């Protein structure tokens, strides 16, 4: 253990200081628990939390709605001589006749060589390549599901992805892909697993529900984890928050607001809610892409339908994510060890003739 390798004098000093820090943290957590319950009461009185409500007849109809899911992953390996290889996996999950435990699954693998100065640059390039692959997959799924009265495509991630990538051509292509789905009567839903930032906190400040900076709640995850836990205990059912327009949680300092403006200028509106399926479950952000203006009541009705589809139709008992999202994530996952083995195969073939391996060995020493 790393703990045992640390110098004993240093460990002794740190342990005593940790005991004092723990006492202070205990008091802070007590205050957070108290403040979160007070805030829950304030939010509850303003109808911020909603239960997922659908009768049997509605659920039977939802089960028959076609649905697909798309996800992608990547690994970048190499770097010798400035050449990297990006391994990309893209998965499509398609249920053309509605709910099923055996949907159609299509998986595409891509190997793309890229030249870059360092890992930071290659990561950004790789992420964009993966997203372009996902856009192509969304169109393929839309071609299978579109043309009917109503269908859905779930994206494992946000609608605007990458959130800070403001390339005009890329934004145009992504908006066109989402608009194509819209013309085919397909609702595109972003299922975001990592809640980041302080958009909901900003909204509460704007509505003066929370005043100014708050020492107890720093970001949305801290705030919602405690408050939505109380909401679930109170209602004994999954809950989600009042749907917000993307702009309602942005500030002038928020870089994502600048990216969203590029999408909105092209006609795209995004609404989102925070969703907690169980007391011990994680918090997710559910995003909805729109190319029309709806009233507040219409937005609420749309989200109740979306949440019913996700939670009551496609989320199995004991799980907190919809089945298509789970399948797509697992099927597209390019694991690090697999990417390194494939890269080894590429280099083995590349260096099979002549004295190229001598050059490689000399170059490798400079990376050690």
Segments the model singles out, each with a brief description of its role:
Residues 65-75:
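Two-metal-ion RNase H-like nuclease active-site motif
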Residues 116-123:
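Conserved P-loop NTPase mechanochemical-coupling segment
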Residues 73-76, 93-96, 159-161, 194-197:
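Short loop/turn segments at secondary-structure transitions that flank enzyme active sites
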Residues 75-116:
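Acidic, metal-ligating active-site segments
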């Amino acid at each position: 253990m790393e703990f045992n390798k640390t110098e004993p004098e240093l460990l002794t000093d740190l342990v005593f200081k940790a005991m004092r820090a723990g006492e202070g943290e205990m008091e802070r957590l007590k205050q957070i628990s108290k403040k979160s319950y007070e805030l829950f009461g304030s939010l509850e009185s303003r109808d911020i939390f909603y239960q997922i409500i659908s009768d049997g007849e509605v659920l039977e109809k939802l089960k028959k709605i076609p649905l697909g899911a798309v996800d992608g992953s990547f690994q970048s390996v190499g770097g010798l001589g400035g050449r990297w290889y990006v391994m990309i996996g893209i998965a499509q999950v398609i249920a053309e006749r509605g709910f099923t435990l055996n949907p159609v699954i299509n998986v595409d693998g891509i190997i793309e060589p890229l030249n870059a100065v360092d890992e930071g640059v290659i990561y950004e390039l790789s992420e964009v390549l993966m997203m372009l692959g996902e856009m192509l997959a969304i169109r393929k799924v839309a071609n299978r599901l579109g043309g009917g009265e109503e269908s859905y495509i779930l994206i494992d991630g946000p609608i605007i992805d990458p959130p800070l990538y403001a390339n005009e051509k890329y934004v145009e292509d992504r908006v066109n892909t989402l608009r194509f789905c819209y013309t085919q009567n397909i609702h595109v839903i972003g299922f975001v697993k990592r809640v980041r930032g302080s958009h909901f906190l900003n909204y509460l400040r704007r509505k003066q529900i929370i005043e100014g900076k708050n020492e107890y709640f720093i970001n949305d995850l801290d705030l919602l984890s405690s408050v939505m836990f109380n909401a679930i205990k109170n209602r004994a059912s999954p809950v989600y928050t009042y749907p917000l327009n993307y702009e309602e949680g942005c500030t002038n300092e928020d870089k994502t607001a600048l990216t969203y403006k590029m999408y909105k200028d092209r006609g795209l509106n995004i609404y989102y809610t925070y969703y907690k399926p169980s007391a011990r479950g994680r918090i997710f952000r559910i995003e909805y892409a729109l190319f029309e203006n709806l009233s507040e009541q219409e937005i609420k009705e749309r989200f109740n339908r979306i949440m019913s589809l996700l939670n009551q139709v496609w989320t199995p008992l004991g799980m907190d994510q919809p089945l298509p999202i789970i399948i797509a994530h697992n099927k597209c996952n390019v694991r690090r060890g697999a990417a390194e083995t494939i890269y080894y195969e590429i280099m083995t073939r590349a260096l099979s003739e002549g004295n190229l391996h001598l050059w490689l060995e000399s170059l490798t020493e400079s990376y050690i």
